[in-house]
UniProtKB/Swiss-Prot annotation:
SUPFAM superfamilies named among the record's database cross-references: NAD(P)-binding Rossmann-fold domains (SSF51735)
Pathway note: Amino-acid biosynthesis; S-adenosyl-L-methionine biosynthesis; S-adenosyl-L-methionine from L-methionine: step 1/1
Keyword annotations of the record: NADP, One-carbon metabolism, Phosphoprotein
PANTHER family: DTDP-4-DEHYDRORHAMNOSE REDUCTASE, METHIONINE ADENOSYLTRANSFERASE 2 SUBUNIT BETA
Region entry Required for interaction with MAT2A, spans: 319-334
Protein name per the record: Methionine adenosyltransferase 2 subunit beta
Native source species: Homo sapiens (Human)
Length: 334
């Protein structure tokens, strides 16, 4: 239940067991996180919750029991949760983020990435909530990095176009909103396929089989907990300064191809990497990708906002539960 102020607890002593309703001290600052079941959304929800915010997350298929189940394509459902909870901040993480899926399901992707984002922005404006819309470095074509916030976007694929159209829909419906563009993400995944970085781990571990790895596209892997920290810092700055709005960039600062990431992963776990083969040609299958869409983050850095986890440290923290000889640990620790 959104905004509850009481919870049930069990009081047990030998010979007696009572169910007691107790008052709960809920922080005054309220944040709503969409896509809270996803890799980034989980990190954002956790970051706010651990820093004296009353955080409510919403999801759809995987929402229960931890999060509110909300279909973002249902405008009535969106209206009700926002007007019932009255958040000070909304972090909109929900999106179709897989470029190849967007190419194959353009209408469904546009409904979520564009239409739902515009409606969320309108509802946020109605209650005076500060909306942070999570966008992507794929709004740029990758031919002239690094990109500043005011540089003209030119997406190469439909995913980038839907994220750019989502930005426009958000800012048209909510003049006080913020757009946060970010690159490829990794972090504490529930399964390796949840991130385009962590999904490489099995190829790294199975060293008896050669694996082709992209060595063409330049990426800047970014830990979700760093993005979550930036979202919280941005929200807290905004609560003190209403002029904090518009478009912002955040990114890790270690430039790597997927081949270089895979080699770094192997090195972090003292695994061989000689079976990994760098492919320097431009990919011919799937949605077109930008060669180098590096983001200039100086605007946020000037505001004193930012956090960066070194890739070697972050990836080791994220992947150790998935080591083949220690995979049983997932059931205990992950």
């Amino acid at each position: 239940m959104v905004g509850r102020e009481k919870e049930l607890s069990i009081h047990f002593v030998p010979g007696s067991c009572r169910l007691v309703e107790e008052e709960v001290n809920i922080p005054n600052r309220r944040v709503l996180v969409t896509g809270a079941t996803g890799l980034l959304g989980r990190a954002v929800h956790k970051e706010f919750q651990q820093n004296n915010w009353h955080a409510v997350g919403c999801g759809f298929r995987r929402a229960r029991p931890k999060f509110e189940q909300v279909n973002l394509l249902d405008s009535n459902a969106v209206h009700h949760i926002i007007h019932d909870f009255q958040p000070h901040v909304i972090v909109h993480c929900a999106a179709e983020r897989r470029p190849d899926v967007v190419e194959n399901q353009p209408d469904a992707a546009s409904q979520l990435n564009v239409d739902a984002s515009g409606n969320l922005a309108k509802e946020a404006a109605a209650v005076g909530a500060f909306l942070i819309y999570i966008s992507s470095d794929y709004v740029f074509d990758g031919t002239n990095p690094p990109y500043r916030e005011e540089d003209i976007p030119a997406p190469l694929n439909l995913y980038g176009k839907t994220k750019l159209d989502g930005e426009k829909a958000v800012l048209e419906n909510n003049l006080g909103a913020a757009v946060l563009r970010i690159p490829i993400l990794y972090g504490e995944v529930e399964k390796l396929e949840e991130s385009a970085v962590t999904v490489m781990f099995d190829k790294v571990q199975f060293s008896n089989k050669s694996a082709n790895m992209d060595h063409w596209q330049q990426r800047f892997p970014t830990h979700v907990k760093d993005v979550a920290t930036v979202c919280r810092q941005l929200a807290e700055k905004r609560m003190l300064d209403p002029s904090i709005k518009g478009t912002f960039h955040w990114s890790g600062n270690e430039q790597m191809t997927k081949y270089e990431m895979a080699c770094a992963i192997a090195d972090a776990f003292n695994l061989p990497s000689s079976h990994l083969r760098p492919i320097t040609d431009s990919p011919v299958l799937g949605a077109q990708r930008p060669r180098n869409a590096q983001l200039d983050c100086s605007k946020l850095e000037t505001l004193g906002i930012g956090q960066r986890t070194p890739f070697r440290i972050g990836i080791k923290e994220s992947l150790w539960p998935f080591l083949i000889d220690k995979r049983w640990r997932q059931t205990v620790f992950h």
